[in-house]
């Protein structure tokens, strides 16, 4: 199964983590990867990493979909040019995936601010993927495999890149139905779980405390959950669970502790930070962002551009390598180890 890998913002750590990650894979597998990027950026990154004594793959060994730059990109200095380039890399990879040239895409981090400065109004890569593929409903799902127990943390966000004050208005039974359907389909088709157990977080502290700390649970979330359970009798839906205790069982399963709390096959978080705080606390190096609902696989490391360390040689490629491994696994290709050799 071939994959497209993007450089992300070339002023960030994307070029570095890509070259480091591919250096840890068997050379006979390199023919499966196509890089959407700029050769000059890769060559300069490789030369710098060699001077810094870092292990990286020579870009000459890679298959490149070249996008030339009009301006010089300096590591750690985000610009309109770097935003324009990162959007072009992503667009190329999407077009190639739509054409069936690759089974999936692994995207390095981009800067939303640079996209805005370059004239692109999309809030993130997920939204671009949905737009260019004509996909009405997609989900932002995070996967992390424990290096201790191999248990997989699976968390779907009901809402994504919106202000916290907009979350209650954005949450609707119809929207949750769409996300739940995507999650169940993913668990069955990609994780082979026919009767999954899915926990749904509450919105308010203590899930509203019977309406004393917020009305959303009482007025529509609990009724929606009851209706969803009737619609999916073969799936166990648990909730709304108070958010401050929901992921305790996940932590026990992650670290292999005796588990008085329950770990679930998947978690549905109602807003961005509610889901990503536990994900990043447990699985910052292992977590992968997966877009579900697309006609092809898309994964991404669960971190940003890290402009502050770009060019220093200290960026950790583990999450990018995990994103490659998950993309291969989910596209039913070869399974790579999820930890660096």
UniProtKB/Swiss-Prot annotation:
- Which cysteine pairs are joined by S-S bonds? none
So what EC number does this one have? 1.1.1.262
Reaction(s) catalyzed by this protein? 4-(phosphooxy)-L-threonine + NAD(+) = 3-amino-2-oxopropyl phosphate + CO2 + NADH
Q: Which InterPro entries match?
A: PdxA, PdxA_fam
Mention any one GO cellular component term assigned to this protein in its UniProt record: cytoplasm
Give the enzyme's main class according to its UniProt record, as a single word: oxidoreductase
Q: What pathway or pathways are given for this protein in its record? A: Cofactor biosynthesis; pyridoxine 5'-phosphate biosynthesis; pyridoxine 5'-phosphate from D-erythrose 4-phosphate: step 4/5
Q: Which GO terms describe its molecular function?
A: 4-hydroxythreonine-4-phosphate dehydrogenase activity; metal ion binding; NAD binding
Annotated GO biological process: pyridoxal phosphate biosynthetic process; pyridoxine biosynthetic process
Q: Which residues bind a divalent metal cation?
A: 161, 206, 272
* Family matches, as Pfam families: PdxA
Q: Write out the residues that bind substrate.
A: 126, 280, 289, 298
Q: Which cofactor does it need?
A: a divalent metal cation
Q: What is its main location?
A: cytoplasm
Q: Which UniProt keywords apply?
A: Cytoplasm, Metal-binding, NAD, NADP, Oxidoreductase, Pyridoxine biosynthesis
Q: What function does this protein fulfil?
A: Catalyzes the NAD(P)-dependent oxidation of 4-(phosphooxy)-L-threonine (HTP) into 2-amino-3-oxo-4-(phosphooxy)butyric acid which spontaneously decarboxylates to form 3-amino-2-oxopropyl phosphate (AHAP).
> Which family would the database say this protein is a member of?
Belongs to the PdxA family.
Q: How does it assemble?
A: Homodimer.
Q: Which NCBIfam families match?
A: pdxA (TIGR00557), PRK02746.1 (NF002744)
Give the protein's recorded name. 4-hydroxythreonine-4-phosphate dehydrogenase
- Name the source organism: Thermosynechococcus vestitus (strain NIES-2133 / IAM M-273 / BP-1)
Gene this chain is encoded by: pdxA
